[in-house]
A protein has these predicted regions:
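Active-site rim/loop-helix segments in enzyme catalytic domains that contact anionic ligands
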Residues: 1-146, 178
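Structural signal for conserved beta-strand scaffold positions within catalytic alpha/beta enzyme cores
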Residues: 44, 85-88, 153, 185, ...
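The feature marks non-catalytic terminal segments
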Residues: 2-5, 95-105, 125, 146, ...
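Active-site adenylate/phosphate-handling loop in enzymes that bind or generate adenylated species
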Residues: 132-179
């Protein structure tokens, strides 16, 4: 792995919003860090229950949440993730009974479908509408349980504006600050260190193939259910805000 910004960190917690985000945004990075001898952990905030489904994958009586979670478990295994958790469920629960943070959904703000914003029908228990202190505490509980010494999540814009991504930036940053841990955001802005994880393209592609309900892999590209194409991310920018 070239351009390693993580220094002495040996146990890195990736905080993501939905099943598939860990593989789409950071699959190659997770594989590279694991290959370097570090242990990587994935905390996923929602079950991705409002995501689109490829035609023919799930019948009318199918359990979408169960499918999403099975895909998530398989993808994490393929990446060599040392531990995974769902926000609101121990070990990612600071106090009180376990709870579910629901997928907020989103709405595209442009015709090219590159910039997202809040959905008008976000449920009352949506992650993006949750108490920020409660979420930060749950993230901190998970970080402590896994012995994390660094946290990674989205930048303040959530990458492409998804409200769950935007919300997690603030909550994860607060959790890292409270624990005194280095906080890294995924970024292509000036000052970001670009980690070249291209040697781990195959691992990233393998993890992405776990998500057959949502996307398909064609060579070094992934194709979303809506037809949008993007290169598999093997050069990943991170920075300390």
């Amino acid at each position: 792995m070239q351009s390693d910004p993580f220094g002495a960190a040996r146990r890195v917690l990736f905080v993501h919003a939905h099943p598939d985000d860990e593989s789409i945004s950071t699959g190659a990075l997770i594989a590279a860090l694991t290959a370097s001898g570090r242990r990587c952990f994935v905390l996923t905030a929602t079950r991705g229950e409002r995501g689109e489904v490829r035609p023919g994958v799930l019948d009318a009586d199918g359990d979408l949440v169960a499918l999403r979670l099975a895909e998530w478990a398989d993808a994490c295994s393929r990446l060599g993730v040392a531990g995974r958790a769902l926000l609101g469920t121990p070990p990612a629960r600071a106090a009180g009974p376990a709870r579910v943070y629901a997928d907020s959904g989103m709405a595209w703000l442009d015709a090219a479908e590159t910039l997202a914003g809040p959905a008008p029908d976000a449920p009352a228990d949506a992650l993006s509408l949750a108490d920020a202190d409660e979420v930060a505490a749950d993230i901190a509980a998970c970080a402590e349980a896994f012995g994390a010494d660094a946290l990674v999540t989205y930048d303040a814009g959530g990458g492409y504006g998804h409200p769950d991504h935007v919300f997690l930036h603030g909550a994860a940053r607060a959790a890292a600050s409270g624990l005194g841990l280095p906080f890294f955001e995924l970024s292509d802005a000036a000052g970001a260190v670009v980690v070249d994880a291209s040697a781990h393209l195959d691992a990233a592609a393998s993890a992405l193939r776990s998500y057959a309900s949502q996307l398909r892999v064609e060579g070094d590209e992934l194709v979303h259910v809506g037809g949008q194409r993007q290169p598999i991310a093997v050069r990943v920018g991170v920075r300390r805000p």
